[in-house]
Amino acid sequence: MVNLLKELEQEQCRNDLPEFHVGDTIRLATKISEGGKERVQVFQGTVMARRGGGSGETVSLHRVAYGEGMEKSFLLNSPRIVSIEIVKRGKVARARLYYLRGKTGKAAKVKEFVGPRSSKK
């Protein structure tokens, strides 16, 4: 029974998503329908947290625009997500970057990671 549930969940998960980690800056494009029309909206931000697993996995993105910090959460396996593009890799020592919430400007920056990403999780 448990194996059957895992198989069903694997079928619903997307395989076209790139591998990204907390601290990376990504550009996430989502489909939005307004007034009967559909358009694509792009949100670029730093990955603050990845929660859950399987079909219910979510990602929280943080971005500073016009001096105000914004935070948005997205379901990774949602059919509304059109594409995910990695802009730059970040070098962090935390699994959750909630300390970015109160920061603006240079304090909200994450150091860029240069080098190969390890395959360990």
Curated annotation (Swiss-Prot):
Q: Does the keyword Ion transport apply?
A: no
Lineage top rank: taxon: Bacteria
Q: Name one GO molecular function term.
A: structural constituent of ribosome
Q: Which GO terms describe its cellular component?
A: cytosolic large ribosomal subunit
Pfam families per record = Ribosomal_L19
Q: Does the keyword DNA-binding apply?
A: no
| Gene3D superfamilies given in the database record | 2.30.30.790
Keyword terms of this UniProt record: Ribonucleoprotein, Ribosomal protein
Which InterPro entries does UniProt cross-reference here?
Ribosomal_bL19 (IPR001857), Ribosomal_bL19_CS (IPR018257), Ribosomal_bL19_sf (IPR038657), Translation_prot_SH3-like_sf (IPR008991)
Q: Name one GO biological process term.
A: translation
The job of this chain, per UniProt, is described as: This protein is located at the 30S-50S ribosomal subunit interface and may play a role in the structure and function of the aminoacyl-tRNA binding site.
Q: Which family does it belong to?
A: Belongs to the bacterial ribosomal protein bL19 family.
* Name of the protein this chain belongs to: Large ribosomal subunit protein bL19
Organism in which the protein naturally occurs: Chlamydia pneumoniae
